[in-house]
Amino acid sequence: MNVINGKIDCKPIETGYDESRIEILNKRLAEMIDKKVIHGAAYCISHKGKVIAHGSIGRNNAAGIDTAMQPDTIFEIASVTKTFAATAIMQLVEDGYIRLNTKVGEILPQFAKKPFEDITLWHLLTHTSGLYPDGGCFPEAAPKSAWELVDAQAEKWDGKSDFDWISAGISGGLRRPVGAEWQYCSFGFAILGEVVTRVTGINVHDYIAEKILRPLKMSDSGFYPTAENAARCFYWNCEQKEFLEKVTSGEANGHYDEGTVWDNIPNTAGGLNSTVYDLVRYGNAFIYGGRFEDARILGRKSVEKMSTVQLSGVPDHCWTANEPNRLYGVGFDMRQGPAYSYSEGTIMHEGSGACSLDIDLKEELCAAWFVPFDEGANGWSAEPLYNVQNIIWSGLI
């Protein structure tokens, strides 16, 4: 199966990385494509601040059209977006506008009443707010997820009056007491996006572009496809392909939710588009104390805070887990265990569908990979995620 190579800064051996492991990575990705676990893959690996591997294999779509995935294919990074929301919050902490223990109700009045009045920004960032988690985390069917509650209210919206999506989303109350349990809550990161907008007076999408994406020269990243880059976007079906073609031609502007209530809800839980190369630039900023090349997005102490385990003795039962002590940083996952070979203290985040960004601060190794699931994944598979991570980290000499 043909592998397309992208731009690199140096050969792997120059940074102390075994190039033969990249051959194994390509071999295993090809096998996963043959088994229909994934449609294709794009990856980028940097070591000691230098890109040492950058490639792609397989198809750039899930519609069965035989066009190749490229190293610079743009894709939806899904929940990896949450780390950008967390970074924006930390920037406002650094600038003295908020603290991690600021109560959400001090900024958003919908939270300034029972049972939400004790929820802080920190609780949202660590998934311990007690708010109902994403659908599918637990078997019970009611109350509905925040997104379903918003959707139900949106159907009644007259299209003219202000739509209170926050009240709609939290109308189910709390599933657990504040701080008692780790429950994966994407809605909490939409709330964090709204906090950024309210505190700065700048739409959070624009804030992230101005304060994170542009300084790091993440030129292929943004919340919506544009006429300039839509032709490079991965698509899941022919309907999405047609929409992207309209964006390319100028018939559509890329804002797929324009004119709906969703256009007013921050897409900071999972709406960013990027490339593996751009994500590695972002990851390197954390490896080097909040700076990369000539950009500064955070101070060193903020990076240390975000990459320090925040929870102690907080259980996680999401998706049938039975973890008595969930390891989590500020907006970043810090899971450890027999499935992973990265260093203790590594920060990472997965995106559904799937992709992963793993940042090993000790080894100065950062990897981003996009592995869109095919039918053989049955909705989710560890093989293109955890197994690939182990292959990548095995190259360290």
Task: Explain the meaning of each model-derived region.
Residues 52, 64, 72, 84, ...:
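Short, well-structured active-site flanking segments
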Residues 307-317, 376-397:
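Short, gly/Ser/Thr-rich active-site loops of penicillin-recognizing serine hydrolases
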Residues 39-41, 52, 203, 353-356:
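Short loop/turn microsegments at loop-to-beta-strand junctions
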Residues 2, 116-341:
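Short, surface-exposed loop or secondary-structure junction motifs
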Residues 341-347:
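Short, hydrophobic/aromatic-rich segments at coil-to-beta transitions
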Residues 53, 357-358, 364-374:
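Short, well-ordered beta-strand elements
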Residues 3-6, 13-77, 99, 167, ...:
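Short, conserved catalytic-motif segment at the N-terminal edge
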Residues 24, 31-44, 64-124, 176-187, ...:
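Short active-site loop at a secondary-structure junction
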